Amino acid sequence: MAQLIETVKKQTEKLRIRGLYNPEKDARSLICAALNLDPVDYILCTNKNLCDSEMSKIDSFIDRRLKFEPVSKIIGKRYFWDLEIFVDSNVLDPRPESEILIEKVLENTSNKRSILDLGTGSGCLAIVLSSKLGQSEIDGIDISKEALKVARKNANKNNVQVNFFQSNWFSNIDKKYDIIVSNPPYISKSEFVKLPRGVKFFDPGIALYGGEDGLVSYRIIARSIVSYLNDEGLAFFEIGQGQTNAVLKIFENQGLSLVSVWKDLDQNNRIICVKKDA
């Protein structure tokens, strides 16, 4: 029988040889998930002898990682803000940049409490906002029925109330909101081919690809958004690197004005907020 500590070393080396970033962290995460161990259990069980069935599950997880599948998709979860979010191949992995969007919405809510999450995916934005804003009325829409199943599962898991329903952007929406949030597809054609394999092959393309210039979704949203925002309503969008001026122009052409732009940890413009004037 192999010991846990030796197994971690061997699996780490496999991942390192493959050229994966942070191989030891990945190996530990996957092995803990395979054995249902939390970090404390892991420390206490490093001399544990592993049976054949345990080794088989570990090998299965490591083999998937060697094919560049993200750890979160293998173990089926990722932490976002302070919540555990279930993820699978039908939804985009929640990313740290999107936590900035949450932060800025929370800073600017005041009495604005009806919120729409456009293209909700896993539901992470709507669910965190619901957990922080209590009695707010929050809707989340997506064109993908499979993504909506994931979003509802996450809402139930985190004990929050969000109304999720299918809509192609605004097609099935019949009311106005104080706040609209969205992390739309914004990867351009030239950027898409350069994406890491873990993103390009394991996140849904519909949640990534924003057309030739990456701006198609913003144009579609901008054409209708004024009709779905209350007066003085705010809209928060995640944007791609170098897209600030183009995205702002798209929304200004539809009668919205800039409130602010915020940077991510790499000092790239990442979140833009626009307003519907009264």
Functional labels for PLM-detected ranges:
Residues 8, 27-28, 58-59, 68-71, ...:
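A general structural signal for well-ordered alpha-helical segments in protein cores
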Residues 1-43, 47-50:
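Non-catalytic accessory regions of SAM-dependent methyltransferases
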Residues 32-108:
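Conserved AdoMet
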Residues 30, 68, 98, 125, ...:
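Residue-level signal for inorganic ion chemistry
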Residues 186-216:
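Mobile active-site "lid"/loop adjacent to the S-adenosyl-L-methionine
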Residues 84, 137, 161-163, 257-260:
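Conserved beta-strand segments of alpha/beta enzyme cores
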Residues 212-275:
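Conserved Class I SAM-dependent methyltransferase catalytic core
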Residues 96-194, 198:
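Conserved SAM/SAH cofactor-binding pocket of Class I
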